[in-house]
Amino acid sequence: MKKTVPLKENHLFRRIYSRGRTAADSRLALYVRGNGMKGCRLGLTVSTKVGNAVVRNRVRRRLREIYRLHEEQVLGGRDVVVVARSRAASSDYRQMERSFLKLADKLELLKKEGPE
């Protein structure tokens, strides 16, 4: 099992926002940038626009779980920042998962499945 390191430093978030590749929909925005390391780093951003603390924490837990379940498919050497938009608060788990997978596929973040 791969271990993803949390991304916490503000200057790293800023670097990913300014120099990373991005994809977005109505629920999530995904930023990806190479980090030159073997493993991945994950950052989550859920602003106060999403809702109160209970709602924001629920969204954060769902995003963390979605990433954890698909962690083996994620290509290494990437910094990933997931930004929850206000519509994420009213979305259920499956909608958020579909959204994440669609955006990750768009940014070529996931390993291609098929014969090797």
Q: Which residues does each predicted region cover?
A:
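Positively charged, solvent-exposed patches that mediate nucleic-acid binding
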Residues: 1-116
